[in-house]
Amino acid sequence: MPESAPTTSSAHQSAIDVPCGPPKNAAVGGFPTTGTPTPCIAEENKRNYDQFKYIVANNLNTKAGLAAAFAKSFKVAMPMTAIAVKGDWVPVQTMLQWMPELSDIGNIEKLYYTTAAASVEYALVSLHVSSRQNANWVWGTFEHQLNPGRCDTMGCFDSFGAEIPAVLPNKAAVNAQYGACPKTKPLKTLMDNANLSPVWENYCLKSTEVDYGAADGTPYVLGNSVIERIVGNGGISAASCIACHAYASFGSNGSPTASAAAMLGYNPTGNPVPDVLAGSLQFDFMWGVLMAP
């Protein structure tokens, strides 16, 4: 059974600072499209202070600053301690529409990490974490164990923290449940030492990615059932965090070139295509700042 938080307040964080909008591929994940309030997902991106300091200190947080960086062929290299996080939040009322088996809001508050914004309570359903521990970054995606279709398409793999290290996709049904993801003793020890709420035991590492593909050229894939499938382009079979973010770049005007920006719609996998990056400087795998107005 999913773990419960000792109290609701102990699993709360600061308010969400992005709007909640209807996802463009709701039907793929069985996500509701009508109701009160209007079903929506709030997707926010956060960066740790080390990454923030590097970006601001080098004037890389404005179009003018990026244009100046391009003019002097500045090589963007985030500090090794840089971390970026993407979290997807769903209003608790919508959670009950999406998964009626949750029964009531009180149960959601026990099973999910929650917060409130503008008098609306949200539950965290998915989490991307990227860390610059190597040149290509380390990419990991996490899902709440109750996410419908959590391991669909690519399966779920965690050789360190999951007692069941490999869960294959259910090819007989889509958006089914995959059960709990009980943690190994080493991971539970780390979580206990960090004084984490037990509610985090309900979140599962889906897999990680550190390179573009295998030695034989087969591209690696990594996608989240909510972030890529419901909010993104609707599929996981051609999703790759590292391949998509390799095209994060800017041209002479401080904005992504048309060819680089166009790759976002194609779910690129495998090694980057050099010609796409012609006339661009890479932004060390970070799209978010480049896409800001």
Feature-to-residue mapping (PLM):
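Conserved small-residue
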Residues: 1-243, 247-293
